[in-house]
Amino acid sequence: MEDTRLKSVISKLKPKPLDIITLKGDGSNRKFYRLKFKNSSAILILPQEGFYGKREALSYYHIGKFFKKSGIPVPEIYEFFEDTGILLVEDLGDIHLFDIPDEQKLGFYKKIILILAEIQELVHEFPLKHTLETVVYDFNLMWEKEIIAFFKWQDLSVSKDFLDKIKEFFVKNFPSYKLKVIHRDFQSKNIMIKEDKVFVIDFQSARLGPGEYDLASLLLDPYVKIFNDFELVKKLALKYCEVVSKDKEEFLRNFYFFGIARLHQAISAYYRLSKLGKPWFKKYIPVAKKRLYFLLKKFFVELIKIYEVNNVL
């Protein structure tokens, strides 16, 4: 218990835990501990140091409470120590959707699509004042956090003329959409399975934005091998389209566009995390690049031509 914050919060708990187990945090800068009591357990989340960590914890608390009240399957929040940003939440076990064998995954995805559709309809009640960073996913967020980050974290040297050309492409193709509630990182490591039930975690970055973005995060997820089959991706995407009653042509256009935005984001994140001492993310870079190349070649020929001339992919 080297962290003084951990010692402090443990001293406030009644009853005291019988054992404290450190858990791996994957891509997060937070620290996670499983507290074992006589007949139960809970997860303690320590925020990253500084103002951002506390702000992130506050968003987690308010959005988590909102989702729970709205019937979304998320971990119950037992305690929130606002002065430190420490959270004590329900223990959902250790099995993420990522861990489920490929041959068993498909049945879960059908359930998850229904949960995603429920989340996205909570627009009018969503606690906007507790969003982290921005209230809305818009063009500027996509451009700075996903497209520019894609080049930055790969250390790709690109000219102003090149950036002007690709910005022109993204401006021209950025679609109009109805605002929905989006998770912003809706992928297999942020979905847990307990007793065959699905739970959504790591929702602190939720905000308003295009529903197709979260669907693309889910179905183009580089962690999941079954989505190397594009026909399966399209089949599940159309299942979502049917559930939310969208125009098929407009929906697919938006899905593919936000799919390439999301894959830019994923690739930049894998490079960034690898450079920050988490090398296990490197193995997902080729998968993400292959899927991005496929989408660009099939649906966005204008952009792939610019990329190929500049040896981007």
Language model features with spans:
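Regulatory N- and C-terminal appendages and interdomain linkers associated
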Residues: M1-T22, S59, P279-L313
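ATP-binding glycine-rich phosphate-binding loop
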Residues: L18-K36
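Active-site acidic catalytic loop and adjacent metal/ATP-binding pocket
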Residues: R30-L35, L44, I119-Q120, E168-L215
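ATP-binding pocket architecture of kinase catalytic cores
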Residues: Y33-Y137, V158
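All-alpha amphipathic helical-bundle segments outside canonical DNA-binding/catalytic cores
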Residues: Y78, V136-D138, K248-G259, K283
